[in-house]
């Protein structure tokens, strides 16, 4: 399955057997997989992988205030379709630049709620989800901006460790 929260290949195991021992299966799989480098991980690794893959989480990254164009999903709107719920609103929606983008910071990890500032000091938005990417070797995050913007520019990120420069990416 690649439909999970992280976008990685994985498996889901279901059993109708009431006597099924999930712990026993878990220990067996870890033991047999250890020779191939299989290790257990926690939710934070899946969270970071989700951010790297750009998989959005409703309630964390997006909510009802966003339209499909602001989050990069405008290509999924079929304006030629005769009728569907919300059609009129979407047809009349001005296509704007994105309000939900990615950000990278080479100096520190990012956390939900870190504030974003423009050069002049005005608040530009906040980090909706963040972490450190061991694969990319820098801080990564999804950001919610106060207004639609293009990509490839710098913002200041105010974190618990101080203020750092971050590059806005798609």
What are these language model-derived features?
Residues 1-94, 98:
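Glycine-rich, acidic
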Residues 66-170:
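Glycine-rich, small/acidic residue-mixed loop/short-helix segments
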